[in-house]
Amino acid sequence: MRTHYCGELRKEHIGETVTFYGWVDRRRDHGGVVFLDLRDRSGIVQIVSDPQRTPDSYEQANALRNEYVVEITGRVTQRPEESLNTRIPTGEVEIYADKIKLLNAVGKQLPFQVSVADTETVREDLRLKYRYLDLRRERMAQNLQLRHQIVKAMRRYLEDLEGFIEVETPILTRSTPEGARDYVLPSRVNPGEWYALPQSPQLFKQLLMVSGLDRYYQIARCFRDEDLRADRQPEFTQLDMEMSFMSQEEIIELNESLVCHIFKTVKGIELQRPFLRLTYAEGMERYGSDKPDTRYGLELVDVSDIVKDSGFKVFRDTVTNGGIVKILPIPNGNDVISNVRIKPGGDLFKEASEAGAKGLAYIRVRDDGEIDTIGAIKDNLSEEQKQEILRRTGAKAGHLLLFGAGEAATVNKTLDRLRQAIAREFNLIDPDKINLLWITDFPMFEWNADEKRLEALHHPFTAPHPDDLSDLKTARAQAYDLVLNGVEVGGGSLRIYQREIQQQVFEAIGLSPEEAQSKFGFLLEAFEYGTPPHGGIAYGLDRLVMLLAGEESIRDVIAFPKTQQARCLLTDAPSSVDAKQLKELHVASTYKPKS
């Protein structure tokens, strides 16, 4: 029977006889004495098998190899001074093995080394194919334990301190337009009809508020059939919350307290409150982003009014046609960023063009503090315009000023990407710094140029600002996003709870009354039976864990993730199914594999 986990043993256990289980992380033979590093999820402890002191275990220890599974019983002893290991928590003790029992051996060559001591970089496809081995590695085991600690902290705070109730909502539901494609499943017992996997529990949690539950939360599984990247998966996990009778301010305050509790409990970090707040307009104006990383400066400066009457046609025409001209000021940029990098073929030009920009204009500030204009800008800015640009940007000797000109969305996207790239190159990002901020006052709608219609910026159940009800199409939403170091980790809003306003929003996004009734009739009817004011928020758990773990991809904080092609390399899903299954579901595939 196990008495301890490997990583638990300390000086206070010296003299005790202990039993534990684990995997052989490493085996070493020093002058006839066998040393084993035994590993389990808690860490590593050193085992000693000396033929003089523990002859009964020596033969077994000598036969062990990496990743063999064993049971060991022995005595905890003090390590000699010269072999103390301060790098691990158990480094002051070692176990003299009295009994070693082999539980299972390794029958094949390992596809990669699992040992803590091994520093090789393993290809991600191998790690995903043999995920059960990858999860034995110290880093991955720690990531999953961190994830567990975060979820536990969330649950304890919400239940014990705020009175929330955890409720599960359906996984099999109906398809509703929420922004991304749904994953759909055919119904065998209802031929020709389909379920959808939920993109979020949005409508059900609102219905729980109609039910009078008052405060709900759920660790919810969500599914979206969208293009993937490092911080997206087809299935993901949210901390989902909904509250009745609370203002936006009260919801924000509660969630700041929740986040502070998580950081304090899990990382021992005291966060400063209140968190910074920016409106959507301020975020776009200063950073070109609604999720800015504020750990560094490099704020954008709008100079549209300065250059609107300049001799530079590109700037003049841009402003005349309703566009903007903004500058990304880069201190000491002259010394590092060459003209070649900004012109076609250069890395910064490529970064800008991928964001939709057609080109980059720039000026340099000489060592004497004067502007050194080049190319098409030369002689097309008056001295007064040059001096006003210097004043507004605060540019000094050595500054490089990168211009973006065009539609506001393209300019902001371009300069946001360049801002991030420059910050990385100039090492302006402090990895230990934690900057949290709220973005508020989002627009209710954005224009979908492909479909020639308005669509909800968040979702169509977000409540408009009460001051903007006279013109919903230009209204601000009562929405709020929480941003951590440039990554959106949470987003929520006050909800519409009156049928008339909900119908107006459906109409604004192009849903006819008949379509609205067909898709959301159950919600509209619920609003007839005394719906309370309510609002909520959802946190991307995978992203939050990724950031707290210091990882670059959410795949490294999910036990069994998919690739960027939405495949599981471990189980080879998705896969084909046999004709009998398809027949039972009344489904036929029209896909023809390429020859």
From Swiss-Prot:
Predominant cellular place of this UniProt entry's protein: cytoplasm
UniProt-listed Enzyme Commission number(s): 6.1.1.23
PROSITE patterns named among the record's database cross-references: AA_TRNA_LIGASE_II
Domain of life: Bacteria
Catalytic reaction list: tRNA(Asx) + L-aspartate + ATP = L-aspartyl-tRNA(Asx) + AMP + diphosphate
Residues reported to bind ATP: 224-226, 233, 488, 540-543
GO terms, molecular function: aspartate-tRNA ligase activity; aspartate-tRNA(Asn) ligase activity; ATP binding; nucleic acid binding
One GO cellular component term noted in the UniProt record for this chain: cytoplasm
Subcellular location: Cytoplasm
Residues at which L-aspartate binds: 178, 224, 458, 495
Native species: Nostoc punctiforme (strain ATCC 29133 / PCC 73102)
Family, per entry: Belongs to the class-II aminoacyl-tRNA synthetase family. Type 1 subfamily.
Subunit structure, interactors included: Homodimer.
Free-text function comment from the UniProt entry: Aspartyl-tRNA synthetase with relaxed tRNA specificity since it is able to aspartylate not only its cognate tRNA(Asp) but also tRNA(Asn). Reaction proceeds in two steps: L-aspartate is first activated by ATP to form Asp-AMP and then transferred to the acceptor end of tRNA(Asp/Asn).
Protein name listed in UniProt: Aspartate--tRNA(Asp/Asn) ligase
Site feature Important for tRNA non-discrimination, where: 30
Gene behind the chain: aspS
NCBIfam families to which the protein is assigned, alphabetical: aspS_bact, PRK00476.1
Region Aspartate, residue ranges: 202-205
Keywords: Aminoacyl-tRNA synthetase, ATP-binding, Cytoplasm, Ligase, Nucleotide-binding, Protein biosynthesis
GO annotation terms (biological process): aspartyl-tRNA aminoacylation
Pfam annotation, one family: GAD
